[in-house]
Amino acid sequence: MYGQMSRPLIVFLLILSVCQSIHYEPNWESLDSRPLPSWYDEAKIGIFLHWGVFSVPSFYSEWFWKRWKDGEPSVVNFMKQNYRPDFTYADFAPMFQTEFYDPNKWADLFQAAGARYVVQVTKHVEGFTSWPSKYSWNWNAMDVGPKRDLVGELASAIRNRTNIHFGVYHCLYEWFNPLFLQDTANKFQTNDFVMRKTLPELYELVNKYEPDLLWSDGDWMGPDWYWNSTIFLAWLYNESPVKDKIIVNDRWGYNTRCKHGGFWDCADKFNPGKLMPHKWEDCMAIDKQSWGYRRTTTVDELYSIKELIALLIEIVSFGGNLLVNVGPTSYGTIAPIFEERLRQMGSWLDVNGDAIYATKPWTYQNDSMTPGVWYTSKAGTSGTEVYAITIKWPSSVLTLADPVVSIDTTVSLLGYSGSVKYKPGVAGGIEIYAPDLNIEDIPCLWAWTFKMTGLKNA
């Protein structure tokens, strides 16, 4: 008995020893060999939060300060009409009060939205940190404005109330930091800004909050060697407190996007429209004009829930994740229209989550005959399960060209307990007879999922 029990223990210890012996070198060949922790691919859906001093003017976009300095007419006129002549951008910071910020409510909302990870902007290009950073004196949320640790509060709420993974966004550069401007003037032959500001902040963020995901940005201003990216990532993977679970993106230098990193997002609102050779993400905003909150937003500038669901389905069918951005207000709330979108998305996922979470792309990503039908798949107890998700409710028959039926094929409609009939298509494929339902009996709105098992080509 002792020998039988000790054998699996020995195997476990050997595996553990091998895992602990892996050491990543500070070069991309070594760093890119690190396997992506499985939770990220299984998660599929995240929430992005752009929140900072730019949320106070809440005009134009989160690039308000830069556009003001660049002389953008709409921003210049806005300032002339509403603020005294000597008003500076720093004067907005004390007005960033976040007085209604309740991280517990936010955490509950994100859970209701069906999100499996959250990425909070901890520092955007304005340089203001949402945590009490030692390296951003008097330009952080504890010293000025809220007088709160906005990052720590949300991290605690997420971890205490949900099963959501907590991530942080950090911008490598800052528009007007004198150290960065001097490095730029020196053509990056110096990196004082990186050594005295960027890297200390990154180490501080990771050690203090132990995030599951680190979303880097602002990389386009310099190459990876200027940012010391590979050295930092080697520490992150080898020595940091999150070395076994952390996931990063590809924004570590203007020469790294779509080439290196844990997952690729390549560009904002990236949708390749095809399978990619690497795990990828589409980060997008419900407000099509801005990542930060705008007081001037109109309904026609927002993603409708049907558009959002259709995008989610398409992205997942191609093997991607969808990171959905909302911009909170300066007083710490999420506007009702954005909350509604998130809750609607969650209600759809309550019915159709099996076709999204932990799925893999199928042989076909969209049907070759019927437009608006997308496929996902996952391993089931009796073989591969294939999900056909249609963004148009079929009036009677849904004809699909790509699934090949067998005598063992079964078809069901997610959220519906009744039987679903089908027959082989005349020219191949399958013809699915949509249940004759009253509108109040249809299991969900916006898109519907037919689950197929026992296909010959699954």
Which positions does each model-derived feature cover?
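Cleavable N-terminal signal peptides of Sec/SRP-targeted secreted and luminal proteins
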Residues: 6-21
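N-terminal secretory signal peptides that target proteins for export/translocation
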Residues: 1-3
